[in-house]
């Protein structure tokens, strides 16, 4: 396919137009008084959102050169969202300001490579300075503040704080569409996996259609159990203790399943069999996790265990097990806390070492099950459009809260970036174009504050000057229009979010400034309509 080429200033200005188009659509959403953006959908109701990355992902420009610029800024928003889960609009505003100031200096004769080095050095220094100013987030009230600021809703903030308190910092908090007007929290305490009973004859609670086992023994094996002879020695020992038994195996079938069902129906013993979750190596790892949580030994031939030769010593325990047709929930497993902590540390290392997004996601799920369960926030609203918008806000707030717990918080409202400017006072000892690069970052850092003020109906430049002159942590509460101690007012940002926004904006701006040519596909000319012979009759059936 034929290509169109653009070079030097022409290329960079076309990229800048694309950057501005996307950034102008996104930055109106910044701050508590930010506007919404309506996104058209091919199917269903339009989406109303103020989430930067959601808006950015929808934007494709018709001009291929400008579209490259838009896609570069989209990358800033997406990467910031992936790493920190929030701060996408801040990153976009910073990138636009860095590109604008950078191109102005390139046009005046500055060397793009020198500017890039200065920008990168300044971004690193700002990141270090912000981290040094961060305050640890530990108590529930501080967590609720961070979540409230991100979601712009105190009810959502309280729910997220409650969820995090109950499932722990590594616990999974998911968001679903609710079926009522209220937004609700539901927490699964303990371990839950997506496999239910193999036979409905194991049900002990006919009304709830559940098998409920109180203080049971738990057998966990990688084997498929077909012959009852394999299980008989163990079943007899369990029966002597008059305890229920949960069997988690690759499968239970044939004679073994029939015998278990007969014993359950006759109430000779309370028993329930479920299939192990997952596949292959992941299944084995998940079974090992369950064994650690319940204090069981994983019965597997490769570990030296044969099912017909083991006793009660390989069985785990729990306070309660509830099994329905789709899920199994183990509450208060009898494993040692130290063993679980070691396993958690091992999985964390695996997450850090993995370069596969899918593997990391699955490892994170295992980590959550080991470290505290799963919380589900159900977003309630009057209409589908409102529900989707609320769901987006809750997801952003969860990500921001987890980032805050991880690295701490700094004053929000754009004030921290404006007040960290003294870190760049000596231009980092650089000179020439690198020094200019530092000054470009200095000008860009106040832009998020300016747009937060602008969107709230204030003069952005006046607000910036006032905030820069104030002590650290004092700034504009855009929701009320007053200048306050931001930490006391609960206006906080996760430092991880802000640091990533700066780093990603600097990275993309540097790449764009050092771009010397663009290569895009030449648009295809529309083919002329084919001429016909003019007869109006149809050939064949008229489908």
Swiss-Prot record:
Q: What domain of life?
A: Bacteria
> Which regions are flagged for Basic residues bias?
534-543
> What are the record keywords, sorted?
ATP-binding, Chaperone, Cytoplasm, Isomerase, Nucleotide-binding
- Gene Ontology biological process terms, A to Z: protein refolding
Location of region: Disordered: 523-543
Q: Which residues form a coiled coil?
A: none
Question: Which subcellular locations apply to this protein?
Answer: Cytoplasm
Q: Which reaction does it catalyse?
A: ATP + H2O + a folded polypeptide = ADP + phosphate + an unfolded polypeptide
Top-level EC class as recorded in UniProt? isomerase
Q: What is its EC number?
A: 5.6.1.7
Q: Which GO terms describe its molecular function?
A: ATP binding; ATP-dependent protein folding chaperone; isomerase activity; unfolded protein binding
The record's function comment reads:
Together with its co-chaperonin GroES, plays an essential role in assisting protein folding. The GroEL-GroES system forms a nano-cage that allows encapsulation of the non-native substrate proteins and provides a physical environment optimized to promote and accelerate protein folding.
Relate the assembly described in the record. Forms a cylinder of 14 subunits composed of two heptameric rings stacked back-to-back. Interacts with the co-chaperonin GroES.
Q: Give the similarity note.
A: Belongs to the chaperonin (HSP60) family.
Question: Can you name this protein?
Answer: Chaperonin GroEL 2
